Amino acid sequence: MQRIDDVNEIINFQHIAKNIKPDPGEIPSVHGLDIYGETLSLLGDVCGDHIIYVDFSKRFNLDERIKRTELTDQIEVSNKLKELKNKSGILLSDVSGHSITDSLLNAMLHQAFLVGASYELSNYGEITADLFETINNRFYQSSSIDKFITMIYGEIQNNGDFRFISAGHPLPLIFSNEYNKIVNIDNLSLVNFPPIGMLPSESDIDGKFAKSILGYKKRYSVNTLNVMGSGDILILFTDGFSEQKDGQMNYVAERLEEQLKISKHLPAKEIFYDVKKDFMNYCGSPDDDATMILIKKN
């Protein structure tokens, strides 16, 4: 009987995970950009990687928010809400550990982010770094030091500007169509913070209540990249693409650029499937979830 109960619990957990897994229809639509991404999961819908697509006009009632802010003379908030119609957000996370229950942290992050985003849009007209300070602090207080989440959240505008915060996550890559290679962005002084839940936030109003022998995390700052040229590709990914077989196989370093040279003329979805096929040929049977999101400038 215990085994049957365990199987039923796993099935129930699969159902919960499926409800927060992004539908293909949620992929943002931004004028001048072609966006596509998927997770290659080891355990079906239950996964240590997670994507939240934020097409602001689909996720939130921007027009009603704009109307309400204009009625109360919140002109700055109204203007920021209008700007959201020309951009979309993407959150990509990766939970430490490979057990089924580890993915519960992604479900917690999913709900915390969307609830917080709704509040911030209504009050500030934008998603601010303060939301992630609060999320980080709550995760620190409710999970152990070995249970954390790497995360990147960014917003892409129709002109190709990508502004993002990274918490222990692999930094984005840019493939240049003109130079036919992944360009070096190391000289841009991009900032990568500790993973979500590893250190309390020194700037969060409640952060000092959290005791930490390792100290406190500095306030999040926002990085900026620009996908300038026609055909350029911005690449977001989890470490499943760079660390397979206990870190012995790195697809990003060894194969990704060559595959993009071959497939760069295709739409983002077809490029992704070419990369996926090459990745599976490269590593055989993956031992970690792997996620990649491609943003191609038309």
Language-model features: locations:
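Conserved subregion of the PPM/PP2C metallophosphatase catalytic domain
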Residues: M1-L33, E38-L91, S96-S99, H110-N298
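Catalytic Zn2+-binding segment of zinc metalloproteases
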Residues: I100, L104
